[in-house]
Design a protein with these regions (language model features):
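N-terminal acidic, proline/glycine-rich, low-complexity intrinsically disordered segments
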Residues: 1-6
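Beta-strand-dominated extracellular/periplasmic modules and repeats
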Residues: 14-288
Length: 288
């Protein structure tokens, strides 16, 4: 398996940002979900965010040159189509933490900007769509879906992840549609088996506005290797998570701050070089 040693090429980063923004614009549900938010809450949130900005300006004595550079950078985030990337990398992990702190079942983490709904169905046991000769270590994943009381759930696991070079289909050129994206339906016993490849760690796109922030701040752009999942079952809360691999140096300093110890897998290595993993999901019933 190869890992990405350089940032995504410029065309891929630009296309990635444009695709993420376009897909978000086609989904009106975020606007509908908050349409009834009371003005008082909107005012409180806006005032507190602005107050935090004002406090930072005063504390660090921000200059006009820095202020104008900030304005130019904020404009470039929109021009580069990188608002989804910016928010998902640096903000979403706290939103997810607050939204799911009541759960008794599995803990989740961020969705990230590269989810695409309606991936191909593959049943309870199947192989994720991939190219002939797909590069990467073969990985077989066995698991179950149950409710918090232990009842098996015939739910679904939507799986998507990067390839062995760190690229996602639908967001990078020269990849087949739905490559390494699939939906698996657990059987009546809640069991599923998925065959895929182990993804690579990668850097988020660095040729746009987010990359300029990373360079100016002296940060790194790496995300550890991970599998994205959405796990659902009727009458239960949707679980969005990422599953990680042991030994990845960026499990400790993920640019997106999304790694949790309980989300790190324990793969078994077989004589032929392939790997297998067992990881199951416990879903919380929906609250009335």
């Amino acid at each position: 398996m190869t890992t990405l040693e350089t940032p995504m090429d410029a065309a891929s980063a630009a296309a990635s940002g444009a695709s993420a923004t376009a897909r978000f614009h086609t989904d009106k549900s975020p606007y509908d979900a908050v349409a009834g938010t009371p003005p008082e809450r909107v005012s409180d949130l806006a005032r507190e965010v602005l107050s935090a900005v004002h406090d930072t300006v005063r504390r660090h004595r921000v200059t006009y040159d820095e202020y104008n550079a900030l304005k130019a950078w904020l404009i470039s985030v929109g021009e580069d189509g990188e608002w989804p990337l910016f928010l998902d990398v640096w903000v979403e992990h706290v939103i997810e933490e607050v939204a799911t702190d009541h759960r008794e079942g599995n803990k989740g983490t961020i969705e990230g900007p590269y989810y695409v709904p309606n991936s191909p169905e593959r049943g309870a046991r199947g192989t994720i769509p991939m190219r002939d000769g797909e590069q990467g270590t073969p990985l077989v994943w066995n698991g179950t879906i149950t409710s918090t009381d232990g009842t098996p759930l015939a739910g679904k696991v939507e799986l998507w992840h990067a390839d062995a070079d760190g690229f996602y289909s639908q967001f990078a050129p020269n990849l087949p549609e739905w490559n390494l994206r699939g939906t698996f339906s657990a059987g009546p016993d809640g069991a599923f088996q998925i065959t895929t490849i182990r993804p690579a760690p990668y850097q988020i796109p660095t040729d746009g506005a987010c990359g300029k922030l990373i360079a100016a701040a002296g940060w790194h752009a790496w995300r550890p290797a991970h599998l994205h999942v959405k796990v659902s079952a009727p009458g239960h809360e949707l679980l969005t998570a990422q599953l990680y691999f042991p030994g990845d140096p960026h499990n400790q300093d993920d640019i997106a701050s999304a790694v949790k110890p309980e989300l790190v897998l324990e793969p078994q290595v077989h004589p032929d070089g392939s790997q297998s993993v067992a990881y199951s999901f416990v879903l919380d019933p929906e609250k009335n």
